[in-house]
């Protein structure tokens, strides 16, 4: 049993749940949680088992938005802006996880998506191999990326769609009673994760000044959303509409 990423599961054949990682799918953590707690959220989890990819999904781990951060050199090259706009993305080398969805999202925004192993990200930022990267704010600070990329961009291009995954063969070996215990534990973990992340994110943002981090607000978000239209076009329009509706 482990925490996986919904956006990575299409790599294993579970296409449906990966749609939750589409750019700008949810406006905030509250909407994401509402979806996760709904029948649609359960439908997304059930799709993993139906995909016969070797896993069953027991619950959601609702995390905050993934946002970008850039190095001092990239910031200076952009003219030391006090806010961030879509046109500034052009040509920036942004490290992304090696998933088709994240690569296509960054490319749609005008950046040069650059898949690099997470363990190599700090040195890649430090040496200038990439101009920036993207992640949740807590991971950004916990991994000290702020030391080499102190400019944080509030674009919230997607959310950390964590999923509690279990080996399917192991799941099938459990009794119905044991499966009930696992489902209850997953439900408790999901609730605790949401509360913890919401609190921790605010604490990290409050520490920006003392850590020397500059927050660059995105001022033309509608243009970012429009730029990603082609990313959406490749996927199930009806399911996307249900996910975005907010009526779960």
Locate each region found by the language model.
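Hinge/lid segment of periplasmic solute-binding proteins
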Residues: 34-54
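N-terminal secretory/targeting leader peptides
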Residues: 1-31, 50-51, 55-248
